[in-house]
């Protein structure tokens, strides 16, 4: 009887309002999972976007956490060795085999090692069945037949050392200074995946093989297939290639529970290369693994607290209530398998650390006393539910890599993989449990947590002296805890966007450029390029291309134009504030971005084909009714001034600026002085930004989507045809004047033992470079990049990666080649000499039939994807317009690709790249 009473009481308690039964979450029905007899698990997820493409990932459920003390760095070293020899593919043959398929290392083939996992990734077309089989055979050998030859191991030591060296910068130093506080009592603290360079220098092939055999076993693996592939075919590939792996058992992955560090700590990170001064409060708490409805709600509560804090902080900065800081943020980050951190940060204006501390204390204490309002919570819920509903509507267009990554995360954490529909429906139902009161309780739980630390970041001695002592921070906390603070008043949301369109606007001419490609001229002079994509995406892309950029402005303004553009992006449009615009954009399924470059400005809006009008409204308002919030401008302006003041303290940026000024004899390359920036008002910035689109006749609108022309004409004439000429039109820019003398720049100010090398070679093309020539140069550069990788990375073990990039300036009629790498300081001359020798040899040799074939395969794959991707097709048309003044130039690329010959490529390369006009060499060395 007592047991029955207890049971009835328990059931009644669980059914009380506000209480959740820990019901399991539903797995996405599209996901196929299983396990082979040898223990290997698999996940198959059919996804038809992009068409005929598939991602194949091999996940090893072991990373650096499982290393012994004498193995720190071995997990990462083993990952590198998978590309340096297996039983069937010795030495460099694995990479060569991938390249023979037209796959590129880094883009199509890659791998990474983290604390918890090691993952190998290949992306390739599904139409090439022989290649699919061969890739699966490589995965099989990665799983069981790596060779670890001594010669290859010794060669790779230098590559890994240079990878470690390449990351020695201010960000790395800041991370190292934070780690003892953030990762206290975690295994992560002394198990960075890159490891110890002493281990890298001394580990033997036998030790690498032992680690490999201990962990690379089927029961410690998951194979993930995501893409446009039949699930039965995918399963057959897995079984045919991976079921024969021996059913050996991997060692058991150990678990190190994180212990709370239950006392308040204080940290100051003083680094001259920090871009800002600021103060932050970090909390550490157990990670919420979302396995059931209860944890689903709990994770949403933590996430909403972060979003509510960020939203309120930005609103108060925009309103002018917080003029003493230049910005701030809250975030949640994973710090261990079982632990996370929530932090709240504000950035100081200048070096006013006391003002920053006051601002953060006031924000936190206001929430302590009043919590968040029902209006704020409703706004966040509504916005997030709209995002989730949009995700349901757009699930067929999910990014393939992101989708695969989410599946890998689900596999790693052993959590359900929810479909967009289930996520939306669960959120709509379960978020009713999240109230102002429940968030207040969650907030108080956080604030009472003793596992916390204060962090102050400073970049100069003045700021360091102004940093608060632990006693001062504690006193300030007590002061604000006892201070009666006014509740925050939510300003509400204005979600209307009024557009004054001209009903008289019309199309004055029309021309067919190619199949599914049309050019329209509007009565106001604007040009419209309409393209129908071949895919099934329900996306509409609108890109306004202005032939005005920052080079249209005099030297006294040029470097501030991008800042003005950023201020506009953060201020909203028309009647909508920045926060209201985010909500309006979510409800109308639109996004907007902009970019200012030398000769052009791009304004890009993405909308939906079943509701395109909001996209046209938004681009109209961004051009005709842009705005700059005074407080946003003041904040950005202050940050720019501080960055200029401290430029001498950031050697990498100073080096890049010196190289920029060296390559051009033009005042427009020079940075403005502090007083020039300070004199530039918000009104000046807004006027400058509006001048970028001051004349419709200088704008081309590129519109791409799977939608008929007749459905768009009315929107085009109404919203694009009604854009009027400005009273102060801006002239088109002129190319920067090139420096005519060779030059060398050496800066000895690097704070870490690493050299940064850059070499620019300029070639005078005399005439514009057409598309066939550009393709020939690109084919050559792919072969050159491979030579540089083999000679400098693999044979000389001198650099982790070598960048080789060709660029063409159609206005200046010249070609530039950039060679860049980081290395051991003592070797920079040797490696630069070697790189130039490699280029001379490649110029003399030209490219081979096999190399041309690899290039053609690679480009053809890109073209196949491009035709079906609205975003990529729009970008391609824009590039054709900017590079060749012809929006239809790209339509010839497939035919030109077939017509390419080794002779034509090598002739073009020798014509254009044999004799550089100028060479500019720079090296950044340690002090």
PLM regions and their residue ranges:
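Bacterial N-terminal signal peptides
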Residues: 5-19
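N-terminal plug
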Residues: 66-69
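N-terminal secretory signal peptides that target proteins for export/translocation
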Residues: 1-2
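Hydrophobic, small-residue-rich alpha-helical packing segments that form membrane-like cores
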Residues: 144, 152-226, 231-238, 247-249, ...
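M16 family metallopeptidases and their MPP-like homologs
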Residues: 45, 50-64, 74-75, 92-141, ...
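Active-site recognition of the HExxH zinc-binding catalytic motif
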Residues: 72-80, 84, 307, 558-566, ...
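Proteolytic maturation boundary segments
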Residues: 22-41, 230-272, 276-286, 290-291, ...
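Non-catalytic, conformational "gating/processing" segments within enzyme and secreted inhibitor domains
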Residues: 150, 157, 209-239, 451-452, ...
């Amino acid at each position: 009887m007592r047991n029955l009473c207890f049971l009835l009481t328990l059931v009644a308690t669980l059914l009380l309002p506000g209480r959740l039964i820990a019901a399991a979450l539903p797995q996405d029905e599209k996901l196929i999972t299983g396990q082979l007899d040898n223990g290997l698990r698999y996940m198959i997820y059919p996804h038809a976007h992009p068409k005929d493409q598939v991602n194949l990932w091999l996940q090893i459920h072991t990373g650096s956490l499982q290393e012994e003390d004498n193995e720190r760095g071995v997990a990462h070293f083993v990952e590198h060795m998978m590309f340096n020899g297996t039983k069937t593919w010795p030495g460099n043959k694995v990479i060569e085999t991938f390249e023979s398929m037209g796959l590129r290392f880094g883009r199509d083939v890659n791998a990474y090692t983290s604390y918890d996992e090691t993952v190998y990734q290949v992306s390739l077309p599904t139409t090439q069945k022989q290649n699919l089989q061969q890739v699966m055979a490589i995965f099989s050998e990665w799983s069981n037949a790596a060779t670890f030859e001594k010669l290859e191991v010794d060669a790779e030591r230098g590559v890994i050392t240079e990878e470690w060296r390449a990351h020695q910068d201010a960000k790395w130093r800041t991370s190292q200074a934070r780690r003892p506080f953030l990762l206290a009592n975690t295994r992560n603290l002394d198990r960075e995946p890159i490891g110890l360079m002493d281990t890298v220098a001394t580990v033997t092939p036998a030790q690498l093989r032992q680690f490999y055999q201990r962990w690379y076993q089927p029961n410690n693996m998951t194979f993930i297939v995501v893409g446009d592939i039949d699930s039965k075919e995918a399963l057959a590939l897995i079984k045919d290639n991976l079921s024969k792996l021996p059913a050996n058992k991997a060692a058991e992955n150990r678990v190190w529970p994180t212990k709370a560090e239950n006392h308040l700590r204080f940290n100051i990170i003083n680094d001259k290369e920090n871009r800002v001064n600021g103060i932050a409060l970090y909390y550490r708490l157990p990670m919420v693994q979302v396995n059931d409805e209860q944890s689903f709600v709990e994770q949403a509560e933590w996430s909403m607290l972060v979003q509510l804090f960020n939203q309120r902080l930005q609103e108060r900065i925009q309103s002018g209530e917080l003029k003493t800081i230049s910005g701030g943020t809250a975030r949640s980050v994973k710090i261990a398998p079982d632990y996370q951190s929530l932090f709240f940060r504000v950035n100081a204006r200048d070096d006013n650390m006391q003002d920053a501390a006051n601002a953060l204390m006031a924000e936190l204490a206001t929430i302590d006393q009043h919590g968040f309002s029902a209006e704020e919570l409703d706004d966040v819920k509504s916005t997030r539910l709209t995002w989730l509903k949009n995700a349901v509507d757009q699930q067929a267009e999910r990014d393939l890599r992101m989708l695969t990554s989410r599946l890998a995360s689900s596999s790693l954490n052993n959590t359900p993989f929810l479909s967009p529909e289930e996520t939306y429906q669960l959120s709509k139902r379960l978020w009713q449990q999240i109230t102002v009161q429940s968030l207040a309780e969650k907030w108080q739980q956080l604030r009472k947590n003793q596992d916390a630390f204060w962090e102050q970041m400073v970049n100069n001695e003045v700021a360091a002296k102004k940093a608060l002592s632990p006693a001062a921070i504690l006193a300030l906390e007590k002061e604000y805890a006892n201070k009666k603070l006014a509740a925050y008043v939510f300003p509400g949301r204005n979600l209307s966007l009024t557009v004054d369109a001209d009903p008289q606007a019309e199309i004055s001419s029309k021309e067919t450029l190619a199949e599914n490609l049309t050019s329209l001229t509007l009565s106001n002079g604007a040009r419209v390029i309409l393209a129908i994509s071949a895919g099934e995406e329900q996306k509409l892309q609108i890109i306004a291309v202005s032939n005005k950029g920052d080079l249209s402005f005099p030297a006294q303004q040029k470097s501030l134009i991008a800042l003005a553009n950023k201020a506009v992006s953060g201020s909203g449009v028309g009647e909508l504030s920045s926060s209201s615009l985010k909500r309006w954009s979510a409800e109308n399924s639109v996004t907007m971005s902009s970019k200012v470059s030398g000769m052009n400005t791009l304004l890009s809006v993405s909308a939906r084909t079943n509701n395109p009008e909001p996209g046209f409204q938004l681009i109209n308002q961004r051009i005709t009714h842009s705005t700059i919030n005074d407080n946003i401008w003041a904040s950005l302006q202050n940050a720019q001034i501080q960055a200029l003041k401290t430029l001498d303290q950031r050697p990498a940026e100073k080096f890049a600026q010196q190289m920029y000024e060296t390559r051009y004899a033009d005042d427009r390359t020079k940075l403005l002085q502090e007083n020039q920036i300070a004199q530039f008002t918000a009104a000046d910035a807004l006027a400058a930004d509006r001048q970028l689109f001051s004349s419709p006749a200088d704008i081309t609108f590129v519109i791409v989507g799977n939608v008929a022309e007749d459905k768009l004409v009315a929107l085009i004439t109404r919203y694009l045809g009604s854009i009027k000429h400005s009273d102060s039109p801006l002239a088109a820019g002129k190319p920067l004047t090139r420096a005519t003398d060779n030059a060398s720049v050496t800066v000895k100010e690097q704070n870490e033992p690493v050299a940064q090398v850059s070499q620019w070679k300029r070639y005078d093309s005399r005439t514009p470079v057409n598309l066939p020539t550009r393709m020939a140069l690109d084919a050559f550069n792919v072969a050159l990049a491979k030579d540089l990788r083999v000679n400098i990375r693999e044979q000389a073990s001198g650099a982790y990666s070598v960048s080789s990039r060709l660029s063409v300036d159609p206005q200046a009629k010249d070609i530039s080649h950039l060679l860049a790498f980081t290395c051991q300081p003592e070797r920079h001359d040797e490696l630069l000499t070697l790189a130039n020798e490699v280029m001379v040899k490649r110029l003399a040799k030209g490219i081979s039939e096999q190399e041309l074939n690899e290039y053609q395969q690679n480009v053809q794959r890109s073209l196949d994807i491009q035709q079906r991707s609205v975003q990529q097709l729009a970008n391609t048309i824009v590039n054709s317009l900017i590079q060749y003044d012809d929006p239809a130039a790209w339509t010839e690329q497939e035919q030109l690709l077939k017509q390419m010959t080794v002779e034509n490529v090598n002739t073009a390369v020798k014509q254009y790249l044999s004799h550089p006009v100028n060479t500019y060499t720079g090296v950044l060395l340690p002090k």
